[in-house]
């Protein structure tokens, strides 16, 4: 077992480092202590088992290893002394090549031995019929045999600055070797024997040794699996513990009663029968709110899956239990729409609903505040205006947050403080989150998924067209308008970018108004620069079918509901991410008629763009699209900067290691179900490791 203090020794004390190198290692790689260096895992490996002959070399060989002799050394001078280079003629029994150096020439001339066998390794260049190798790694054959070089060599993360300061991969390997020698290759095991046996994992000691200095490919694979599992397991233990502690610590108001408000709506006002998925999710929510713990649940549902009905029925449970409920949306348009939908659904039920946004007038707000505090108002829908200090409820029992990734943690916390007993929290998102990402980012929330669309909905037909077929697309829109339908045309920008060949929204609007002339056609325009009132007025005109075409930027991405709209044209579709394209497509297909999404792109497309277009044409399944998006963009990008820190993994990869992540979560849940306080003797290693993680949080910043 390694004494704790050795691992936390400053890197500047390591033999071969010194003050200057220590500073570089800190700033460039975040290495402050021995432990940081040990946790800097190689990002790839070089197979040094194969030796080439010079006559076997090919132009496409990347990195090669040879044995031979230097028979000649010469300095090639140039007009600028700094550009001088040292060239060695290197031979084996099959041929000749050159070795080239551009710096450290004097030291090299003095050090290199003529006619002594060397092992050389490096990247090949081929020029003028001759192979050459710039700045090769070199060992005298006699030394190479003595040191017993690993046949598989690690390549560590590096930066331009480190390379310039001569902290090469070889230097990094040597530093890691030195740490191993100082700590004596001893590593404390931090996983219980039961998990090691169940998961067939090698020991921590064996894993650390073989991740840095693998004996063979089989042991390298085992080391990698062991360390990935360990990393993901401790993230999951933290998240599951957070969930358990939350349930112990925060009591919610138990909604024991299913009363008149819920049953009256269910029996007489439900617009269509609930899908099996909606029923399942409602059952999960009822189990949460019926207990004494505060609900903390994430509700995922693809566009049009019926999340609003589930949210409304949960709010009615609150009303039946003498509580108030609120629903917070990220934009005024979306808040308005929720209000209109829910007001319409609750008409003639006796349940009171109100809307609060930044545009609400002072007089309205005064009445609303009185009704909230008296308990006369049951449901409040609004934007972040709900968070203001002066918005006081008589008894807030449930807070629903729509598209929560648009709200910060502090904003969400303000909702908690609206009652002495924190309200139940239901977070909704129409942006499907891949399972692996949900497990890692929202692993402390309980997750429900509505994975079924209401019956009778026709799947949207998606087509990919090149821009030279725009005229055909417009003719198609005219035919749909003649049937009484409406269309969206979405552009990626407001102002034309000099760097990128975007369609300009204003130009597009002018082109469309020319193609769809008055009085037969009327066109609306909505973009981010309009004032909220102007934006709402344009949306209202479109909603009432006073205009047939809505030209817009992505402000219509979330939540806008116009059942009569049957065509979505996305201009410069290559400029949008998959998730955005899917959200935009979800603005149509909300009625019973067949809907269409047309993706217009330029002829030149990158491979990634091609995959995005093919995925959109192939499937309407938001979860499948989210998985493809995760593979294309990686987890950090997908979650945005707010969440990227959560996923700064050292060795695991959420895309490639999904099976390991699932196993790690299963083991964490299983273990904590049996021993939630980690008191059993066999779990003391875990308790100790968690304690260390809390003390040295900088090492594990990815644990939320």
Regions found by a protein language model. Give the residues of each.
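N-terminal cationic and glycine-rich segments that engage phosphates or anionic surfaces
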Residues: 140-144, 398, 414-416, 427, ...
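Upstream accessory/linker segments immediately N-terminal to the RecA-like ATPase cores of bacterial MutS
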Residues: 78-269
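Structural detector for short beta-strands of small beta-barrel domains
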Residues: 61-84, 122
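Inter-lobe coupling/hinge segments of SF2-like helicase ATPases
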Residues: 283, 294-614, 674
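OB-fold nucleic-acid-binding modules
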Residues: 40-67, 71
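Conserved pre-motif I regulatory segment
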Residues: 23-24, 253-299
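Accessory helical-bundle/CTD segments and flexible terminal tails appended to RecA-like ATPase motors
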Residues: 540-550, 556-563, 568-571, 586, ...
């Amino acid at each position: 077992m390694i004494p704790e203090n050795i691992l936390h020794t400053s890197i500047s004390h390591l033999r071969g480092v010194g003050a200057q190198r220590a500073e570089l290692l800190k700033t460039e790689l975040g290495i402050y202590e021995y432990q940081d260096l040990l946790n800097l895992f190689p990002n790839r490996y070089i197979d040094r088992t194969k030796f080439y002959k010079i006559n076997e070399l090919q132009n496409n060989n990347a990195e090669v290893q040879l044995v031979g002799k230097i028979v000649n050394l010469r300095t090639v001078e140039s007009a600028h002394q700094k550009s001088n280079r040292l060239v060695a003629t290197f031979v084996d029994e099959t041929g000749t090549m050159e070795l080239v150096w551009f710096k450290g020439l004097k030291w090299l001339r003095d050090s290199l031995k003529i006619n002594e066998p060397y092992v050389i390794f490096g990247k090949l260049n081929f020029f003028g019929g001759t192979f050459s190798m710039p700045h090769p790694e070199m060992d005298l054959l006699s030394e190479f045999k003595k040191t017993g070089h690993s046949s598989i060599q690690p390549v560590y993360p590096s930066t331009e600055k480190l390379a310039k300061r001569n902290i090469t991969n070889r230097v990094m390997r040597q530093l890691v070797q030195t740490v191993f020698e100082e700590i004596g290759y001893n590593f404390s095991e931090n996983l219980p024997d039961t998990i090691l046996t169940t998961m067939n994992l090698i020991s921590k000691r064996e894993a650390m040794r073989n991740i840095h200095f693998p004996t063979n490919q089989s042991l390298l694979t085992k080391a990698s699996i062991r360390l990935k599992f360990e990393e993901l397991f401790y993230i999951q233990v933290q998240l599951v513990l957070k969930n358990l502690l939350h349930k112990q610590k925060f009591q919610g108001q138990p909604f024991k009663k299913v009363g008149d408000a819920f049953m009256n709506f269910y029996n007489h006002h439900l617009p269509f029968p609930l899908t099996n998925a909606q029923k399942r999710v409602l059952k999960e929510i009822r189990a949460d709110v019926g207990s004494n713990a505060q609900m903390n649940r994430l509700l995922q549902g693809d566009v049009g899956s019926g999340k609003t009905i589930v949210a409304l029925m949960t709010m009615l449970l609150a009303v039946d239990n003498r509580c108030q409920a609120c629903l917070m949306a990220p934009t005024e348009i979306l808040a308005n729409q929720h209000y209109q939908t829910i007001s319409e659904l609750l008409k003639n039920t006796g349940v009171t609903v109100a809307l609060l946004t930044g545009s609400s007038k002072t007089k309205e707000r005064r009445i609303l505040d009185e009704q909230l505090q008296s308990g006369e108002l049951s449901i409040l829908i609004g934007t972040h205006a709900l968070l203001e200090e002066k918005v006081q409820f008589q008894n807030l029992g449930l807070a629903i947050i729509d598209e929560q990734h648009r709200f910060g943690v502090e904003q969400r916390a303000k909702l908690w403080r609206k009652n002495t007993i924190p309200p139940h929290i239901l977070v909704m998102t129409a942006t499907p989150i891949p399972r692996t990402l949900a497990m890692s980012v929202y692993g402390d929330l309980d997750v429900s998924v509505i994975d079924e669309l209401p019956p009778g909905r026709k799947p949207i037909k998606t087509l990919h067209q090149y821009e030279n077929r725009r005229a055909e697309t417009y003719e198609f829109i005219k035919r749909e308008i003649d049937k009484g339908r409406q269309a969206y045309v979405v552009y990626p920008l407001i102002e034309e970018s000099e760097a990128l060949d975007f369609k300009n929204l204003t130009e597009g609007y002018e082109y469309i108004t020319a193609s769809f002339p008055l009085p037969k056609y009327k066109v609306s325009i909505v973009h981010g620069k309009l004032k909220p009132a102007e934006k709402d007025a344009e949306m209202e005109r479109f909603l009432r079918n006073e205009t047939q075409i809505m030209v817009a930027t992505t402000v219509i991405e979330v939540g806008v509901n116009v059942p009569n709209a049957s065509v979505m044209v996305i201009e410069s579709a290559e400029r949008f991410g998959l998730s955005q394209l899917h959200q935009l497509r979800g603005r149509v297909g909300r009625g019973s008629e067949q809907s269409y999404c047309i993706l217009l792109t330029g002829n030149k497309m990158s491979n990634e763009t091609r995959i995005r277009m093919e995925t959109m044409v192939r499937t309407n399944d938001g979860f499948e699209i989210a998985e493809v998006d995760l593979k294309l963009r990686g987890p950090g990008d997908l979650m945005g900067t707010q969440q990227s820190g959560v996923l700064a993994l050292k060795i695991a990869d959420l895309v490639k290691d999904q099976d390991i992540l699932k196993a790690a979560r299963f083991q964490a849940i299983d273990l904590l179900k049996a021993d939630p306080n980690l008191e059993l003797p066999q779990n003391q290693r875990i308790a100790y490791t968690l304690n260390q993680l809390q003390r040295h949080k900088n090492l594990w910043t990815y644990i939320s």
